[in-house]
Amino acid sequence: MIINVDLHIHSHFSGATSTSMTIETLAREAPRKGIDVVATGDCLHSEWQREIKQCERIDEGTFLLGETRFILTTEVEDKNRVHHLLLFPSFSSVDDFKERITKFSSNIETDGRPNVSLNGEQIAEFAKDVDALIGPAHAFTPWTAMYAYHDSLSSCYGDLTRYISFLELGLSADSNYGDRISELHRLTFLTNSDAHSPYPVRLAREFNRMSVKEATYREIKNAILRKNGNSVTLNVGLPPQEGKYNESACISCFRHYTLDEAVKRRWRCICGGRIKKGVRDRVNELADLPVPKHPEYRPPYLHIIPLAEIIAKALGQNSTFTKKVTKRWTELVDAFGSEVNILLDADIEEISKVTVPAVTEAIKAFREGKVIIHPGGGGRYGTIELPNEEERDTVRDKQKTLSDFLKT
């Protein structure tokens, strides 16, 4: 069977998250985004564990509420500020891991994403001891990421490097970025939302499509490990330019710089602010290949833009959270079942019967690959621009649909 999976989110017990990130809200919103299985996130937190345990238990590591299945995950920050994503097979595994790291953390009961005074190798060793999967979260982001503080997997994970089975690309990178680095060719790439709110523009803005026997932790683990015929068949995510850190830019005024310009200015903007190195430039530093070389098993990468963002631009709204945007998003999802279906597969003529012409034209422009993206940087997301009439007539590569990948 084919499932869509988002393996990195946070609960309302993590810092800077929405109070709406409850298990009930996630269970309700995931199907509207087209997602079958969602990470719990924050599973080390005692109060969040109590919410998770309200769900029906399918097996030791899989839980069900409504139409949505959950698997146990958390993110932790090590002593070098590197973030690691962990997936657990059961609550007993979670409890065992928590017992081992509690003495190294001062906020394990107060923050869903705890800080621990251990390095990546030590955390990976504990993960291995409890049979949990572990890999770098948003690996290229210039804050709190592996490649922000290390130049290689082994620098981060030491003797446990071979135990690392996956790498989360993050919003500012895709497979073409990752596969310019040879040491990553053996790893499964994951594309996850890292959602801090359940809003349509956040939850499942990136997700993975997997071929599994059933929608359970064990089968998802086998897909990540590429065992027993299971696999990740598609990575779905933002174009890298939409990420907050794609290009090098000032974190104060968001002025963009080339790498040479930033170096000459000693990473100080003309406004006096700090220039933060972008993912594109960091990959260029790390890459040992001039162009990406994808291993045979690497799935295609499908770029999507959140539907709420497309609607907001079509309606001339400055925010994706306005009542007008929410109304149009809701009427489309109610009519076609999920955001993924609307963006990629639903008949455009049928869409035109449900929404206003401006939104229909915007979705059509996205499908035709005519949406213009202005890169993000310095902590500000990239922005999109809809084509003018002349640009609408320009022939470009058509946006692929999920059905194009059914045979992968």
Task: Give the positions of each predicted feature.
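An N-terminally biased module of ancient metal coordination in phosphate/nucleic-acid-related enzymes
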Residues: 1-79, 370-372, 381-384, 391-397, ...
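Extended substrate/RNA-proximal surfaces in nucleic-acid metabolism proteins
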Residues: 2, 49-165, 398
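Divalent metal-coordination and catalytic microenvironments
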Residues: 8, 42, 86, 134, ...
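Histidine-centered divalent metal-coordination motifs
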Residues: 8-12, 138, 196
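Histidine/acidic-residue-rich catalytic or RNA/ligand-binding cores of hydrolases
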Residues: 15-17, 49-50, 144-150, 199-211
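C-terminal functional module detector
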Residues: 28, 46, 57-60, 70-72, ...
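Short acidic/histidine-rich active-site segments
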Residues: 186-202
